[in-house]
Amino acid sequence: MVTIRLQRGGAKKRPFYQVVVADSRRSRDGRFIENIGFFNPTAQGQEERLRLDLDRVEHWVGNGAGLSDRVARLVKDAQKAAA
């Protein structure tokens, strides 16, 4: 099954996540199909916290992709911000 989930990057104690479409059988930081955004949980000041390509999220969900719990909350936040 294809899932939309977070892929961890950044430095020790400074996480930075890419939002990716990946096969659920792959490892967390392994190969992915498409990068559709990022999430910076430690953003401060003017730094951008979240960027998602909502059109691509809708495309993948329409084609049967599942969302991880955290990504589902992030998509909901992004939709609120876009409205």
Curated annotation (Swiss-Prot):
Q: Name one GO biological process term.
A: translation
Q: Which InterPro entries match?
A: Ribosomal_bS16, Ribosomal_bS16_dom_sf
What Gene3D superfamilies does the record point to? 3.30.1320.10
Q: Which UniProt keywords apply?
A: Ribonucleoprotein, Ribosomal protein
A Pfam entry, by short name: Ribosomal_S16
State a single Gene Ontology molecular function: structural constituent of ribosome
Domain of life, source organism? Bacteria
GO annotations of cellular component type: cytoplasm; small ribosomal subunit
Identify the PANTHER family for this entry: 30S RIBOSOMAL PROTEIN S16, SMALL RIBOSOMAL SUBUNIT PROTEIN BS16M
Entry similarity comment? Belongs to the bacterial ribosomal protein bS16 family.
Concerning NCBIfam families, the annotation shows: S16
Q: What is this protein called?
A: Small ribosomal subunit protein bS16
Q: What is the lineage of its organism?
A: Bacteria, Pseudomonadati, Pseudomonadota, Gammaproteobacteria, Alteromonadales
